[in-house]
Amino acid sequence: MEHYISLFVKSVFIENMALSFFLGMCTFLAVSKKVSTAFGLGVAVTVVLGISVPVNQLVYSLILKDGALIDGVDLSFLNFITFIGVIAALVQILEMILDKYFPALYNALGIFLPLITVNCAIFGGVSFMVQRDYNFAESVVYGIGAGTGWMLAIVALAGITEKMKYADVPAGLRGLGITFITVGLMALGFMSFSGVQL
């Protein structure tokens, strides 16, 4: 149990997808204007990561891995296309659920919801799972932890951005300029966790 807790904490703080690996920056910067929208996208990314990492782990270990189906047959050259297909299917299902049950959030996310399919944070989580050879339980914990870390980062950035509307930001830095500086300072803050050994 301690191993899973340390894996979760590590994936949220030490190896944060957004602030340590800088993955998923497109939607991270574009949807971080309001906390409510950022939280909704963060939950969507967490759900997709929490489902796609373990599902892709099963696909990899039962079908694609060397010798999984037949001894001597290695289908790992199909990793990328298979993982992207699974992620795309999961995002389509999530999009239909949000459209039916949460139309306000669906409309607020707009074009960025289908873009979760090509969000490199999602694919990065799946790639890290293969690279680190996680089992199914570790994949579930890592997927949820990585999504939670990404959500924590985007909600924190949205909260800071909302507060900065009332600050006297120099004209040349308004918009993305001050956002990049803020993200850099947040990343420096998260670097303090890199010395923690779990």
Swiss-Prot record:
Compartments it resides in: Cell inner membrane
Record membrane topology: Multi-pass membrane protein
Predominant cellular place of this UniProt entry's protein: membrane
Coiled coil: none
Gene Ontology annotations for the cellular component aspect, listed alphabetically: Gram-negative-bacterium-type cell wall; plasma membrane
Gene Ontology MF term list: oxidoreductase activity, acting on NAD(P)H, quinone or similar compound as acceptor
Enzyme class: translocase
Pfam families according to UniProt: Rnf-Nqr
EC annotation from Swiss-Prot or TrEMBL: 7.2.1.1
Keywords annotated in UniProt: Cell inner membrane, Cell membrane, Ion transport, Membrane, NAD, Sodium, Sodium transport, Translocase, Transmembrane, Transmembrane helix, Transport, Ubiquinone
Residues that span the membrane, as ranges: 11-31, 35-55, 77-97, 110-130, 140-160, 176-196
Keyword Transmembrane: yes
Catalytic activity: a ubiquinone + n Na(+)(in) + NADH + H(+) = a ubiquinol + n Na(+)(out) + NAD(+)
GO BP terms, alphabetized: respiratory electron transport chain; sodium ion transport
PANTHER family named among the record's database cross-references: INTEGRAL MEMBRANE PROTEIN OF SOXR-REDUCING COMPLEX, NA(+)-TRANSLOCATING NADH-QUINONE REDUCTASE SUBUNIT E
Subunit structure: Composed of six subunits; NqrA, NqrB, NqrC, NqrD, NqrE and NqrF.
Protein name: Na(+)-translocating NADH-quinone reductase subunit E
Organism for this UniProt entry: Histophilus somni (strain 129Pt) (Haemophilus somnus)
